Swiss-Prot record:
<keyword id="KW-0474">Menaquinone biosynthesis</keyword>
<comment type="function">
    <text>Converts 2-succinylbenzoate (OSB) to 2-succinylbenzoyl-CoA (OSB-CoA).</text>
</comment>
<dbReference type="InterPro" id="IPR045851">
    <property type="entry name" value="AMP-bd_C_sf"/>
</dbReference>
<dbReference type="Pfam" id="PF00501">
    <property type="entry name" value="AMP-binding"/>
</dbReference>
<dbReference type="InterPro" id="IPR000873">
    <property type="entry name" value="AMP-dep_synth/lig_dom"/>
</dbReference>
<dbReference type="InterPro" id="IPR020845">
    <property type="entry name" value="AMP-binding_CS"/>
</dbReference>
<dbReference type="InterPro" id="IPR025110">
    <property type="entry name" value="AMP-bd_C"/>
</dbReference>
<dbReference type="InterPro" id="IPR042099">
    <property type="entry name" value="ANL_N_sf"/>
</dbReference>
<keyword id="KW-0067">ATP-binding</keyword>
<dbReference type="GO" id="GO:0042802">
    <property type="term" value="F:identical protein binding"/>
</dbReference>
<dbReference type="InterPro" id="IPR010192">
    <property type="entry name" value="MenE"/>
</dbReference>
<protein>
    <recommendedName>
        <fullName>2-succinylbenzoate--CoA ligase</fullName>
        <ecNumber>6.2.1.26</ecNumber>
    </recommendedName>
</protein>
<comment type="pathway">
    <text>Quinol/quinone metabolism; 1,4-dihydroxy-2-naphthoate biosynthesis; 1,4-dihydroxy-2-naphthoate from chorismate: step 5/7.</text>
</comment>
<comment type="pathway">
    <text>Quinol/quinone metabolism; menaquinone biosynthesis.</text>
</comment>
<keyword id="KW-0547">Nucleotide-binding</keyword>
<dbReference type="GO" id="GO:0008756">
    <property type="term" value="F:o-succinylbenzoate-CoA ligase activity"/>
</dbReference>
<dbReference type="GO" id="GO:0032991">
    <property type="term" value="C:protein-containing complex"/>
</dbReference>
Length: 451
C-alpha cells in the first residue's frame, strides 16, 4: 500500500462511512474522524504549529491523545511522546537537546517554561501540511535501560513499512479491531496505530479500565503474557482472534490454552530504532523469535545481531542534527547476542548483560527463560551482585501470580550450579513503572540496597 495522502484521508475516500475508531462509547467513521482531525489541526495551526515544529506530547492513551497525535502529524509536526511518569529532572536533562518548541499536556500542566503550551481547541477549517512520506514525524525515547534515553526519529514511510511487515504475518481485515493496549510513548503502541492506518481497519481507544472491559468487541490486542494468562484463567469473555505477545518468555502452555479458545498468539523481536517488530512468528514454545519480516535483514557478526530495514529510524536526534545509527558497513549493531538457524533468529541475551561468576559466563536472559517456564512465575530478572570469592553471583528478582513458591529446589536439575540464584527476591511495586521494560540498572541498584 502506497499512500498519496494522509492515511486517514485516503480511507475517507475509499470507505468513508465505515467505522474507523471506537473511542470509549463513541464510534467515528473515517469521514467523521477526518473532520475531527481537521478541526484539531486547524486549532494547533492557529497556535503556531507549522511543518517541522517539535512538539512534546506528555500523555497517557486516551481518545483525546490519539486524535491530538493525528492532528499534530497532519500539521507536519515532529512529535515526541513522553511517559507522564518520567521524572522532571530527567526530562530537564533530555529536552534541551531535542529542538522542541511546544508542549501539549492534555491532563496536566506544562512544567517546561522554554516550551510554548498548546491547548486542545477545535477551529473550523481543514488545515493540513502536504503529505510527504519521507518527512520526520516521530521521536521515540529508547528504553534507557543502561543510560540516558536517546530519541530515535522515524519517517511516515518507516512506520508504514513496519506495519506492512507485521501484517504480512498477522491477518488484520477491514472489520477487525485492534485495541490500543500499549502506550503511544512506546514504539510498540505506535506500531498498533500505524497497523490500523495501514490496513484501514478499526482501532479501539479507551480510558484506563480493567483489561476485559477494554477488550470488549476487539479482535486483536498487543499484550504481555501476564495479561493473557489472567484473561484465560478468569475465563474472560473476549472476542479476540489474535494476540501479539511481547516483553517476556512465552510458555507453551499459555499459547495452547489460548488456541483452545480460538486465539492465535504471535511473538517476535523488536526495537525502538526499527519502529517495533523486526522478526516474528506464530508462538510455538521454541526459543527462536521467528524469521525476519519482509523489508528486514538480519545477520550475525561475532555473535552480535546486526540489522537493517525500511523501518529503521533516520537517526538519533541531537541538537537539531540526526546522528546516524549505522556502522561503516551500513548496518545497525544491536548489542544483542544472537544465533541464526534455518533462517530463524534466536536472541541469547544482551552482550552488555553478560557477567562472570567464578570464571563462568552467565547470560541473565538464558537463566530467566528457564525460570520463567515455571507456571507460578510471571516475570523474572537475574541480577549480578558483587562477591569477593566469585566476582559476582546471580540473584533472582521475581513476580509471582500467587503466593511465593520455593524455586531453589525446582531449578536444581534445570540450571548449572553456577547459574542457580543465591537469593530470590520479590519484584517491588515501585519498579513496575507502567513501562514495557523494567530497567536492569534500577534493578541492580535496588538489589544492592537489599544486601
Amino acid at each position: 500500500m502506497i499512500f498519496s495522502d494522509w492515511p486517514w484521508r485516503h480511507w475517507r475516500q475509499v470507505r468513508g462511512e465505515t467505522i474507523a475508531l471506537r473511542l470509549n462509547d463513541e464510534q467515528l467513521n473515517w469521514r467523521e474522524l477526518c473532520a475531527r482531525v481537521d478541526e484539531l489541526a486547524s486549532g494547533f495551526a492557529v497556535q503556531g504549529v507549522v511543518e517541522g515544529s517539535g512538539v512534546m506530547l506528555r500523555a497517557w492513551n486516551t481518545p483525546q491523545t490519539l486524535l491530538a497525535w493525528l492532528a499534530l502529524l497532519q500539521c507536519g509536526a515532529r512529535v515526541l511522546p513522553v511517559n507522564p511518569q518520567l521524572p522532571q529532572p530527567l526530562l530537564e536533562e533530555l529536552l534541551p537537546n531535542l529542538t522542541l518548541q511546544f508542549a501539549l499536556v492534555p491532563d496536566g500542566e506544562n512544567t517546561f517554561p522554554a516550551l510554548t503550551s498548546l491547548h486542545i481547541q477545535l477551529v473550523e477549517g481543514a488545515h493540513a501540511a502536504t503529505w510527504q512520506p519521507t518527512r520526520l514525524c516521530s521521536m521515540t525515547l529508547t528504553s534507557g535501560s543502561t543510560g540516558l534515553p536517546k530519541a530515535a526519529v522515524h519517517t511516515y514511510q518507516a512506520h508504514l513499512a513496519s506495519a506492512q511487515g507485521v501484517l504480512s504475518l498477522i491477518p488484520f481485515g477491514d472489520h477487525d479491531d485492534w485495541l490500543l493496549s500499549l502506550p503511544l510513548f512506546h514504539v510498540s503502541g505506535q506500531g498498533i496505530m500505524w497497523r490500523w492506518l495501514y490496513a484501514g481497519a478499526r482501532m479501539t481507544v479507551r480510558d484506563k479500565q480493567p483489561l476485559e472491559q477494554m477488550l470488549a468487541g476487539c479482535t486483536h490486542a498487543s499484550l504481555v503474557p501476564t495479561q493473557l494468562w489472567r484473561l484465560l484463567v478468569n475465563r474472560s469473555s473476549v472476542s479476540l482472534k489474535a494476540v501479539l505477545l511481547g516483553g517476556a518468555a512465552i510458555p507453551v502452555e499459555l499459547t495452547e490454552q489460548a488456541r483452545e479458545q480460538g486465539i492465535r498468539c504471535f511473538c517476535g523481536y523488536g526495537l525502538t530504532e526499527f519502529a517495533s517488530t523486526v522478526c516474528a512468528k506464530e508462538a510455538d514454545g521454541l526459543a527462536d523469535v521467528g524469521s525476519p519480516l519482509p523489508g528486514r535483514e538480519v545477520k550475525i557478526v561475532n555473535n552480535e545481531v546486526w540489522l537493517r530495514a525500511a523501518s529503521m529510524a533516520e537517526g538519533y536526534w541531537r541538537n537539531g542534527q540526526l546522528v546516524s545509527l549505522v556502522n561503516d558497513e551500513g548496518w545497525y549493531a544491536t548489542r544483542d547476542r544472537g544465533e541464526m538457524h534455518n533462517g530463524k533468529l534466536t536472541i541469547v541475551g544482551r552482550l552488555d548483560n553478560l557477567f562472570f561468576s567464578g570464571g563462568e559466563g552467565i547470560q541473565p536472559e538464558e537463566v530467566e527463560r528457564v525460570i520463567a517456564a515455571h507456571p507460578a512465575v510471571l516475570q523474572v530478572f537475574i541480577v549480578p551482585v558483587a562477591d569477593k570469592e566469585f566476582g559476582h553471583r546471580p540473584v533472582a528478582v521475581m513476580e509471582y501470580d500467587h503466593e511465593s513458591v520455593d524455586l531453589s529446589e525446582w531449578v536444581k536439575d534445570k540450571l548449572a550450579r553456577f547459574q542457580q540464584p543465591v537469593r530470590w527476591l520479590t519484584l517491588p511495586p515501585e519498579l513496575k513503572n507502567g513501562g514495557i521494560k523494567i530497567s536492569r540498572q534500577a534493578l541492580k541498584e535496588w538489589v544492592q540496597r537489599q544486601q
